[in-house]
Regions:
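Extreme N-terminal tail/first-helix region
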Residues: 1-18
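Charged, gly/pro-rich active-site loop segments
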Residues: 2-3, 74-142
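A short, Trp-centered hydrophobic/proline-enriched beta-strand micro-motif
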Residues: 14-28, 65-69
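Short, conserved, surface-exposed binding loops centered on an aromatic residue
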Residues: 14-16, 31, 38-40, 59
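Short beta-strand-initiation
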Residues: 19, 32-35, 63, 115-117
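Short strand-coil-strand connectors
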Residues: 29, 69-73, 132
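Hydrophobic residues embedded in beta-strands of well-ordered beta-sheets
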Residues: 32, 46-47, 127
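A short mixed-secondary-structure module that forms the rim of ligand-binding clefts
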Residues: 39-73
Length: 142
């Protein structure tokens, strides 16, 4: 496994630096749970808009280690609830999410007046990326 190379980062940004559906797996009481989520990749992390009272946030609070998979990429990471979407500290990533998710973000599914509407960050730790016959085993740690 090697550190994230420039070439692998370019593939990640091109492939996932927009609206994507990925599988997000969590574990609670030894039982795995997986669901599809819309996600956006930026700087070694995936970002997801969700609700603070959702099962995924509860499960991540109990065990922050998660797994993801999508479009010839699988990885482990640490789930971090960044809190309310509208918090000043989240303004930069929130704007990126508004652009990436523009086709559906304001369709009524999200209530941005609800302080439980939050941003989930999946900070990647390690992963496997496949692209045109090349296998990239990546260590995302700093």
């Amino acid at each position: 496994m090697e550190k994230l190379t420039k070439q692998a980062e370019e593939i990640m940004a091109e492939r996932f630096g927009k609206d994507n559906v990925i599988a997000l797996a969590t574990v609670e009481n030894g039982i795995p749970y997986v669901r599809s989520v819309n996600a956006f990749y930026d700087n070694k992390a995936f970002y997801i808009i969700t609700h603070a009272l959702s099962n995924k946030i509860r499960q991540i609070k109990g065990n922050p280690i998660v797994a993801i998979s999508g479009e010839w990429f699988a990885a482990h990471g640490k789930g971090i609830n960044l809190g309310y979407f509208g918090k000043a500290e989240n303004s930069e990533i929130a704007e990126k999410l508004r652009v990436a998710f523009a086709s559906w973000i304001d369709n009524g599914h999200n209530n941005f007046n609800d302080e439980n509407t939050c941003i989930l960050c999946i900070r990647l730790t390690d992963g496997l990326l496949l692209s045109h016959g090349t296998r990239y085993a990546i260590d995302f740690s700093d």
